[in-house]
Amino acid sequence: MIELEKHYYEKVFGQLKAHFNFKSPSQVPKITKVVVNMTAGNQSSNAKAIEAVLEDLAKITGQKAYKTVAKKSLATWKLRQGMPMGGKVTLRRQQMWNFLAKVLHIAIPRVRDFRGLSPKSFDGNGNFALGFKESIVFPEITFDKISKIRGLDVIIVTSARNDQEGFKLLELLGFPFAKKV
């Protein structure tokens, strides 16, 4: 799955430089990291649910996940500060490119009723957030062996300075954005 990184350096890099009239190659936006996050939801007090989340994340990303804990106490969710909530993995370099290729070529096509990614999911700084309602769109997660279907969030952090640069970068990489109406 190295072809996505190769595609970036051979085609996308030059197209971005020409499109935005960048003078220096260091100005061209690139993907710096991908953060994958999954929570146990209302089962966060259950230690087995947290372990299942960490196992699923490790299977999906190929890297060991670490626990995330609550920053604040919330009585409505029966959550106390420091209580484990889920897991998180930060991917960089080759693992990042492999995971993005898996998302593009395997996970997104398996999403039911997919109508394109929302361009509104950019944060204002060129970073893109993508959510999956079901983790079973990834081939490593089999429906028979999981206790509960959980969703996960994928945050693509770029070096883009604004949303237009980030959008063009991901669009040229092949991310299927929904057409503006």
From Swiss-Prot:
Gene Ontology molecular functions: rRNA binding; structural constituent of ribosome; tRNA binding
Coiled coil: none
Superkingdom of source: Bacteria
Key words, A-Z: Ribonucleoprotein, Ribosomal protein, RNA-binding, rRNA-binding, tRNA-binding
Any GO BP: translation
Disulfide bonds: none
Pfam assignment, any one: Ribosomal_L5_C
Gene Ontology cellular component terms for the protein in this record: ribonucleoprotein complex; ribosome
Family membership noted in the UniProt record: Belongs to the universal ribosomal protein uL5 family.
HAMAP family referenced in this protein's UniProt entry, alphabetically: Ribosomal_uL5_B (MF_01333_B)
UniProt subunit comment: Part of the 50S ribosomal subunit; part of the 5S rRNA/L5/L18/L25 subcomplex. Contacts the 5S rRNA and the P site tRNA. Forms a bridge to the 30S subunit in the 70S ribosome.
Known role: This is one of the proteins that bind and probably mediate the attachment of the 5S RNA into the large ribosomal subunit, where it forms part of the central protuberance. In the 70S ribosome it contacts protein S13 of the 30S subunit (bridge B1b), connecting the 2 subunits; this bridge is implicated in subunit movement. Contacts the P site tRNA; the 5S rRNA and some of its associated proteins might help stabilize positioning of ribosome-bound tRNAs.
Protein name: Large ribosomal subunit protein uL5
